[in-house]
């Protein structure tokens, strides 16, 4: 889990200002204005916590301000020099992590209760750096990943006591990340897990290592080191066994999770090299190797099928209710096969191009390759769509609740896809969106008047009949190449082909194909997540969960506007509140500073600006 995606509701933090677009705009309301000269001397940066409070760092310390009144709630004079790049809200909780460098001593990391300013954890002189975290509400803990120079550590933080339970050392970091041990990088070093055995032990895997850890004390009960990085680490509660495998290895290992004892049965041997291990809804272990795939009965560790199912270039197996979909990935000889629950082939269909995305739908297998896209029918293995759809990149995806169809847009063309019937219709053609190419990581949202397509700097609306209502690209100050960032995400997700677009669209396709017809965005998930975290910390009465719950509830309301920062031809900077249905800037805030500090709160529709590093102003944009 990456820290930059950890908010369960949609707040956009903005570090630069941009310019006003001309036109007559409705004036915004100034809610409050606070001079920070006396309290902080000079404001270095501002952020917003999950409870809505504004966190301001200055020469005289770190302060929490009530976002509704601007009044100081707490101040920590000892926290001078807090590093903004290290600031990270902890999802669903009124907690945040930050680092600061005291006048004397090493850089410290702190976890703060944003509503009270209480320091719940301080690394002090231990020189720890928190990288990322895992919320584990069933266990009532937050598991923090930390580093100390070139050493990996885990910390268990109790939600009931709001304090550290234990810290355990996992050993020296190997490879490139060793150079980043004490930097502010937020990437997780856990590749598999965290997961828990029947006895409650914590199991994690990273690179070539697997660990069994006492979840109560942090004691490492056992560690296992493979020859190469682990491809899979799967725990089966049915037989209380842990399955480990290294990619392209001819060995599968089974461990007893309490002591890490090797209990691999002699009869469980690979015929080829390991590609993957996963599980299905029937609690079987799915073993995928170069010589085919088979099922392991977790009760006996025997192979269930007499003969493994094999196709050339096998790379992925997708379990589903009716059986298994085997995907062979090759640019020239790819194929997709349907295998029933007994291991019998129902059909095997050749596919043009390298398949970088496949999922099951009600009618068949939806796939996207570098050459074409279609649905292969479960009934006969033939294409459902009369004509192939060729996507140059991952399409923008949303769902129309009224028409009950998936909406996809890519390369000037809009498609309506009925998951129930498998029908695909083109509803928009030759739609030219301003400065949008096939590499643009475009995302989509269904609106009452049509389909809204956007990036951080782009807005467009196409009505439901396929007519372009408006399209606009807004200049940005930063030269960051967002398409290259999107491609990096694709590579991380295992897509080793020349494909651009937003990885969020691939996730959305997965959700929709599995029946999640309501867009599963951060805003709609917020309240449920907060309630889960609140129940996990029910014994602690000072966590302001009612505040965070209210803000999450607000975030569920459909947002009619999008905030964009931009500049005009004269380099005049502004924050614009763009109406998604009209494309017009309903409100704007002009910025006076060359490098201003501000936060856009999309939940309460407010903008907080710090002018001249002295005065924080709150504007209501409703």
Model-derived regions: residue spans:
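Bacterial N-terminal signal peptides that target proteins for export
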Residues: 1-12
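Absolute N-terminal positional cue centered near the fourth residue
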Residues: 4-5, 21-24
């Amino acid at each position: 889990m990456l820290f930059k995606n950890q908010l369960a509701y949609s707040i956009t933090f903005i570090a630069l200002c941009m310019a006003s677009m001309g036109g007559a705009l409705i004036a915004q309301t100034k809610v409050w204005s606070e001079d920070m000269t006396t309290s902080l001397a000079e404001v270095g940066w501002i952020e917003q916590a999950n409870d809505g409070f504004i966190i301001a760092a200055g020469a005289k310390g770190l302060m929490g301000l009530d976002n509704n009144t601007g009044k100081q709630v707490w101040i920590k004079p000892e926290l001078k020099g807090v590093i903004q790049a290290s600031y990270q809200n902890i999802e669903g909780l009124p907690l945040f992590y930050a680092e600061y460098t005291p006048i004397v001593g090493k850089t410290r990391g702190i976890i703060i209760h944003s509503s009270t300013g209480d320091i719940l954890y301080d690394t002090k002189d231990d020189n720890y750096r928190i990288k990322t975290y895992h919320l584990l509400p069933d266990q009532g803990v937050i598991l923090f990943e930390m580093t100390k120079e070139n050493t990996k550590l885990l910390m268990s933080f109790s939600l009931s006591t709001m304090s550290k339970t234990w810290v355990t050392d996992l050993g020296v970091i190997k490879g490139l990340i060793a150079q980043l041990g004490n930097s502010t990088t937020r990437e997780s070093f856990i590749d598999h897990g965290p997961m828990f055995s029947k006895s409650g032990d914590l199991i994690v895997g990273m690179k070539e290592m697997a660990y069994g850890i006492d979840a109560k004390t942090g004691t490492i009960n056992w560690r296992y080191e493979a020859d190469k990085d682990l491809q899979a680490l799967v725990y089966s509660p049915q037989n209380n066994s842990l399955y480990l495998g290294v990619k392209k290895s001819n060995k599968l290992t089974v461990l007893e999770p309490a002591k890490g004892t090797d209990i691999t049965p002699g009869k469980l041997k690979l015929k080829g090299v390991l590609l993957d291990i996963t599980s299905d809804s029937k609690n079987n272990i799915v073993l995928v190797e170069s010589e085919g795939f088979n099922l392991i009965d977790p009760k006996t560790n025997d192979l269930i099928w007499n003969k493994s199912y094999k196709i050339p270039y096998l790379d992925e197996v997708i379990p589903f209710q009716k059986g298994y979909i085997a995907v062979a990935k090759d640019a020239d000889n790819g194929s997709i096969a349907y295998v029933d629950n007994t291991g019998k082939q129902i059909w095997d269909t050749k596919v043009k191009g390298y398949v970088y995305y496949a999922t099951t739908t009600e009618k068949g297998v939806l796939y996207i390759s570098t050459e074409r896209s279609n649905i292969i029918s479960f009934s006969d293995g033939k294409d459902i769509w009369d004509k192939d759809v060729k996507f140059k990149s991952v399409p923008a995806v949303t769902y129309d609740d009224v028409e009950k169809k998936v909406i996809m847009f890519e390369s000037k063309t809009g498609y309506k896809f009925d998951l129930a019937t498998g029908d695909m219709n083109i509803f928009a053609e030759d739609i030219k969106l301003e400065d949008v190419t096939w590499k643009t990581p475009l995302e989509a949202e269904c609106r009452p008047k049509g389909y809204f397509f956007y990036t951080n700097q782009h807005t467009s609306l196409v009505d439901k009949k396929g007519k372009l209502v408006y399209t606009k690209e807004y200049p940005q100050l930063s030269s960051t190449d967002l398409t290259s960032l999107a491609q990096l995400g694709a590579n991380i997700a295992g897509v080793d082909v020349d494909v651009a677009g937003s990885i969020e669209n691939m996730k959305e396709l997965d959700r929709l194909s599995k029946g999640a017809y309501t867009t599963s965005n951060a805003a709609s998930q917020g309240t449920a997540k907060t309630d889960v975290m609140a129940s996990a910390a029910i014994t602690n009465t000072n966590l302001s969960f009612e505040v965070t719950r209210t803000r999450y509830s607000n975030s569920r309301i459909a947002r009619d506007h999008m905030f964009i920062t931009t500049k005009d031809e004269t380099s005049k900077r502004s924050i614009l509140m763009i109406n998604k249905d009209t494309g017009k800037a309903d409100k704007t805030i002009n910025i006076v500073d060359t490098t201003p500090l501000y936060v856009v709160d999309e939940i309460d529709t407010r903008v907080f600006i710090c002018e001249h590093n002295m005065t924080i102003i709150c504007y209501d944009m409703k």
